UniProtKB/Swiss-Prot annotation:
Purpose: Core component of nucleosome. Nucleosomes wrap and compact DNA into chromatin, limiting DNA accessibility to the cellular machineries which require DNA as a template. Histones thereby play a central role in transcription regulation, DNA repair, DNA replication and chromosomal stability. DNA accessibility is regulated via a complex set of post-translational modifications of histones, also called histone code, and nucleosome remodeling.
Phylogenetic classification of the source organism: Eukaryota, Fungi, Dikarya, Ascomycota, Pezizomycotina
UniProt keyword annotation of Transferase present: no
Cysteine-cysteine disulfides: none
Family note: Belongs to the histone H4 family.
PANTHER family: HISTONE H4 (PTHR10484)
Pfam families (UniProt xref): CENP-T_C (PF15511)
DNA-binding region: 17-21
The protein's name in its UniProt record: Histone H4
Keyword Chloroplast applies: no
Keywords, in A-Z order: Acetylation, Chromosome, DNA-binding, Methylation, Nucleosome core, Nucleus
Compartment(s) where it occurs, according to its Swiss-Prot or TrEMBL record: Nucleus; Chromosome
Record GO biological process: nucleosome assembly
Length: 103
């Protein structure tokens, strides 16, 4: 790096993008068996067919909130990498304290 400081390529040509943003609904990656395993862990014996889409929706809403808060902590600290502590603080802010990851 030649005197550009901390953060950014400066002016001029930008390099090739390393990560492309895929614009599809990744929530379908939470498979039916994965939801079934989570339910089994919670003690559920039988699962209605409508539960799967409902669970995906609730999970997406929950994760959007946690990720938004974690990214806010990251941006405030002028970092580009979200750390485990950012997630711990985001969960704590939402009233779901998580132990075992520092903080």
């Amino acid at each position: 790096m030649t005197g550009r400081g901390k953060g950014g390529k400066g002016l001029g040509k930008g390099g090739a993008k390393r990560h492309r943003k895929i614009l599809r609904d990744n929530i379908q990656g939470i498979t039916k068996p994965a939801i079934r395993r989570l339910a089994r862990r919670g003690g559920v014996k039988r699962i209605s067919a409508m539960i799967y889409e409902e669970t995906r929706g609730v999970l997406k809403t929950f994760l959007e909130g946690v990720i938004r808060d974690a990214v806010t902590y990251t941006e405030h600290a002028k970092r580009k990498t979200v750390t485990s502590l950012d997630v711990v603080y985001a969960l704590k802010r939402q009233g779901r304290t998580l132990y075992g990851f520092g903080g």
